[in-house]
């Protein structure tokens, strides 16, 4: 084809390894070595937040990929950062009325949250939205990223007085 607006478009790829430092290094190489004027990607919220910050420093457009954290585009309100997926705030706002409709307004919730930026903003968004509809948050506990066995968290949930686990 003729490119975009008559200009040839070329692309390069990099590997984030789903690690913030590796993602920043890869993005920096694309900007400095390859002359990238736009970067897209970020398959995790931590990666996207890190690359977003670098792109803002470099004046390069960043189009966030699969990142759900509010912090990707909302926290620092940067001019060059965009997303094409929904965020945690939207999830909380959409989920709370459904939970309330199906479970009632007088609930006590216990939150188990993945301990990184997506989990933190998801927890905050759901708590704000459900408490706005009358729910009470009994506890919010952060679980180690990558944990596969959550059995240690079950007894505290059962003893908390909560009637909903989020």
Ranges and model annotations:
Residues 45-56, 149, 155, 160-166:
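Hydrophobic alpha-helical
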Residues 11-13, 139-142:
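A structural preference for short, hydrophobic beta-strand core positions in alpha/beta folds
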Residues 1-11, 131-135:
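Signal peptide-proximal N-terminal region
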Residues 33-141:
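Extracytoplasmic ligand/sensor domains, especially the bilobed periplasmic-binding protein
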């Amino acid at each position: 084809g003729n490119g975009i607006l008559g200009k040839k478009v070329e692309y390069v790829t990099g590997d984030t390894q789903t690690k913030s430092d590796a993602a920043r290094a890869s993005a920096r190489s694309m900007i400095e070595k390859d002359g990238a004027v736009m970067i897209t990607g970020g398959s995790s919220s931590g990666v996207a937040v890190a690359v977003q910050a670098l792109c803002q420093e470099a004046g390069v457009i960043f189009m966030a990929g699969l990142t759900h954290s509010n912090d990707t585009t909302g926290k620092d309100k940067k001019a060059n950062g965009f997303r094409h997926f929904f965020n945690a705030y939207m999830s909380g706002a959409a989920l709370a009325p459904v939970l309330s409709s199906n479970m009632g307004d007088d609930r006590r919730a216990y939150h188990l949250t993945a301990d990184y930026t997506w989990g933190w903003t998801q927890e905050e968004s759901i708590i704000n939205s459900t408490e706005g509809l009358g729910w009470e948050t009994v506890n919010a506990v952060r679980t180690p990223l990558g944990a596969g066995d959550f059995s240690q968290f079950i007894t505290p949930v059962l003893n908390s007085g909560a009637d909903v686990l989020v």
